[in-house]
Amino acid sequence: MAREFSLAKTRNIGIMAHVDAGKTTTTERILYYTGKIHKIGETHEGASQMDWMAQEQERGITITSAATTAQWDGHRVNIIDTPGHVDFTIEVQRSLRVLDGAVTVLDAQSGVEPQTETVWRQATEYRVPRIVFANKMDKIGADFLYSVSTLHDRLQANAHPIQLPIGSEDDFTGIIDLIKMKAEIYTNDLGTDIREEDIPAEYVDQANEYREKLVEAVAETDEELMMKYLEGEEITNEELMAGIRKATINVEFFPVLCGSAFKNKGVQLMLDAVIDYLPSPLDIPAIKGVNPDTDAEETRPASDEEPFAALAFKIMTDPFVGRLTFFRVYSGVLQSGSYVMNTSKGKRERIGRILQMHANTRQEIETVYSGDIAAAVGLKNTTTGDSLTDEKAQVILESIEVPEPVIQLMVEPKSKADQDKMGVALQKLAEEDPTFRVETNVETGETVIAGMGELHLDVLVDRMKREFKVEANVGAPQVSYRETFRASTQARGFFKRQSGGKGQFGDVWIEFTPNEEGKGFEFENAIVGGVVPREFIPAVEKGLIESMANGVLAGYPLVDVKAKLYDGSYHDVDSSETAFKIAASLALKEAAKSAQPSILEPMMLVTITAPEDNLGDVMGHVTARRGRVDGMEARGNIQVVRAYVPLAEMFGYATILRSATQGRGTFMMVFDHYEDVPKSVQEEIIKKNHGE
């Protein structure tokens, strides 16, 4: 089957915004006007087409980036709806990775909000061209020009209106097109009846002023237009549109539009702007990758003639077809039933069926072409960020960066039946979401889940209950402490038991010294003259290892200690392996009295990114958490603080930072090293573990 839409007539866009800016409603209207749905679903009624998970409909927020395909003005528009909540940033990142352009939705009353800054920053990193839609013009307090000013002040964006609203709040009746210099007046509730008229007299001066500003701003991005502008020649509408398109695709200019998705105003004009100003796959640089055999850099231009190359950007479990792998095709053509190479894993995969998704309904298709976004059934080994390529022309595309999880909780199944189901459920959820990790704590036997924030883990535990019918208790997280010796000492372990028949006898002298950090336990046999027979030496080492697992202070493993067995004695009849194991453990216990045992705690390297205004708060947070600042760096009006902070003090920090910075602050943390716990904290830990 031939291509239905050429590459030039394809748009891959994302819709991104702060929570509650009306992003999902905007997507709904796009689907309505492009003929994908016949009845509009309202988010506040829990009936939205794109928000198809039960939790999303209940909470009224978008959690997973649902992909859908629509048609407008002879073009195919693939849309990815992304979440606006900070706990779900991986969803935003992975959708930005496969998009060619985006629509940033603002609430016209609030303008740029904290999470808008976060997603804008991510989009800038990925060099994604954007248009801005100031939504909710019908809302009390809506102010279009204020919203535009926040784009300049908070994002330093070269953003300019290409439209102006006629009225606002309840009087929002239409839109002035600053390119055509005409007014679009809405005459019915569904926004399908639009009258084009002359600009109302009271708006003519404002329209002329903003048209002039627009022409000047666009001319500044293009030398030819600048010459015409300076020489006083008229710039035609066609030249102006071409200039806006070029500057937008180069991420030098951001056109701003207005409307009210809820009241069905401005959405069709926004769709026109998607076609007019956002890039097709042909307008953006060819994707780069590495040849797995030669390590040489290769590019894959958007073309059906090139070898097949795609990136898997999302895994989802569908109740009817099972595991779905969403992928973006960068080059080439793929038929269902064919084989591809997962070059990231070095595994061959068979593409069972190919589905085009519309939120959570699907249509089976035979072929996908370059520039398409689709979902495949039947891939066994593919995870987020993997490259899928032609077997004969392999390439590894740049993957998706996954932030480390920052919060963890213990989960415990309520019954034996739940235990088996929980393992399967957690594995499936971890496959779908790379920021969700599952670990079993070897020391406590507990299952610990880690994620990007409390809401993130709430939603996953909730999904475990709903989708997999697993009942589980969720506990508070625990820290993995360690113990060590800080001084050298010598100790004797003497064990003797004689009570008729064969007795027990073991006698050892061991020197204990602190070892380098991370070196673990080292055992040295320095026995001379057979005072401890050779066959009992392994028993001494084993006795020490077993005792060290339970520590000497609070039950945590003893690490980084050297033990040198240098003297002892034995009994011809009564000595045994068991006796020497016990003697070794007694020597360790004795050594603990003089070897200055200490509890160690994991120290995290924490990187906190926050607005300059909140720098004082952030420094206060670090100090209050027994942390120490390692360095600071200014990036525009954002400050990046690096600090070492104990893991024990970081629980709940995501929530504290979020409220201190109104969601504008983010942090990442990675384990760095173990460090001695202060004496006062050590005493508390010992008391707690001894049940005092």
Curated annotation (Swiss-Prot):
It is found in: Cytoplasm. Residues 8-282 form the tr-type G domain. One of its GO terms (molecular function) is translation elongation factor activity. GO terms for biological process: ribosome disassembly. One of its GO terms (cellular component) is cytoplasm. Catalyzes the GTP-dependent ribosomal translocation step during translation elongation. During this step, the ribosome changes from the pre-translocational (PRE) to the post-translocational (POST) state as the newly formed A-site-bound peptidyl-tRNA and P-site-bound deacylated tRNA move to the P and E sites, respectively. Catalyzes the coordinated movement of the two tRNA molecules, the mRNA and conformational changes in the ribosome. This is Elongation factor G. It comes from Streptococcus uberis (strain ATCC BAA-854 / 0140J). The lineage of its organism: Bacteria, Bacillati, Bacillota, Bacilli, Lactobacillales.
